[in-house]
Design a protein with these regions (language model features):
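Conserved alpha/beta core of the MobA/IspD/sugar-nucleotide pyrophosphorylase nucleotidyltransferase superfamily
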Residues: 3, 178-283
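Conserved beta-strand termini and adjacent loop/short-helix elements that scaffold enzyme active sites
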Residues: 53, 80-83, 141, 171, ...
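Conserved core of the sugar-phosphate nucleotidyltransferase
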Residues: 119-203
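N-terminal nucleotide-binding beta1-loop-alpha1 segment
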Residues: 1-19, 76-77, 275-282
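Active-site glycine-centered loops adjacent to acidic/histidine catalytic or metal-binding residues
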Residues: 9, 116, 242
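A structural signal for short hydrophobic beta-strand segments in well-ordered beta-sheet cores
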Residues: 25, 155-158, 229
């Protein structure tokens, strides 16, 4: 298995913070978003290579970071330049995966991740779930009640008995489920090959966007492959997409840590809930 880390975005909402430095190399509590991923991936022996996909603007930043020993991992690390130089000509998340697959000539199992989130779950737990489902495609997330959060990303309707995803939408106006999905995906080899078919259809359909959730949504909607859902509760996945979130990340992490502690001390109670849009925390 190879892990593909999407780092080709421009993070324009973070202003000067990411003007000359990629978001993946920003630090939270002394560790970059990228290093948080690498630490987790080190716990999965089946991953033999980590492929970092950068845009042309920040490619040298990643090469320099690797040379400076700022990518600590026991995996082979390959850094690719997708050739784009602005937000306007970006390839998009799935487009970057397709680019990487072609570049390295790979057709096997794939783990696709973004490198701009803080999280406290273990990626190895999701991988174990993937294996337990006979290596079936896997997305992750948790139950969500906030309409704002549900409309802002990928939303799954999940069979509670089998964990199979019955519908999946990316940024729906009217959500058809209550499970908000994070941008992290496990695909078997057969599904990895379908990425190229998806990209061919995307070129013909302007309604298919750039976000990574459009591919698993396409898989489910068009009955291309089964997808299963791993619930990370009581753990968290924080999209650090705004300056407010980044500058208040210590408060958010403290609240997340308290919620996990509360959950395990009171597993039958429902009082240990952190609002997923973090608005109450960062006021």
């Amino acid at each position: 298995m190879k892990a593909f880390i999407l780092c080709a975005g421009y993070a324009t909402r973070l202003g000067k913070l990411t003007e000359n430095n990629p978001k993946a190399l920003l630090e939270v509590q002394g560790k970059s978003f990228l290093q948080l991923l690498l630490d987790n991936l080190n716990e999965i022996p089946d991953i033999d290579e980590v492929v970092i996909i950068s845009n042309h603007k920040f490619y040298k930043n990643f090469v320099d970071a690797k040379a400076a020993g700022k990518m600590v991992t026991d995996k082979v690390v390959t850094i690719l330049d997708d050739g784009t130089s602005s937000n306007e000509d970006r390839l998009g998340a799935v487009g970057d995966v397709a680019f990487a697959l072609n570049k390295i000539g790979y057709k096997g199992e794939s783990m696709v991740l973004v490198a701009d989130n803080w999280f406290d779950f273990k990626i190895s737990d999701i991988y174990k779930f993937y294996c337990s489902k006979n290596r079936s495609n896997t997305v992750f997330g948790k139950f969500e009640t906030s309409e704002k959060v549900l409309r802002g990303g990928a939303v799954a309707h999940v069979n509670p008995k089998t964990c199979k995803v019955e519908s999946l939408q990316e940024k729906p106006a009217v959500p058809d489920g209550n499970y908000a999905c994070g941008a992290f995906y496990l695909y078997n080899a057969k599904t990895t090959a379908l990425i190229h078919k998806f990209m061919a259809e995307k070129e013909k359909d302007n309604n298919i966007g750039d976000a990574p959730g459009y591919f698993p949504a396409w898989l489910v909607t068009n009955n291309q492959a089964d997808v299963y859902f791993y619930d990370i509760a009581p753990y968290h996945n924080v999209d650090v997409g705004t300056l407010d979130t980044y500058y208040n990340i210590d408060k958010i992490i403290e609240s997340c840590n308290n919620e996990v502690k509360c959950y395990f001390e009171n597993p039958d109670e429902q009082k240990c809930t952190v609002a997923s849009d973090w608005t109450e925390i960062i006021k």
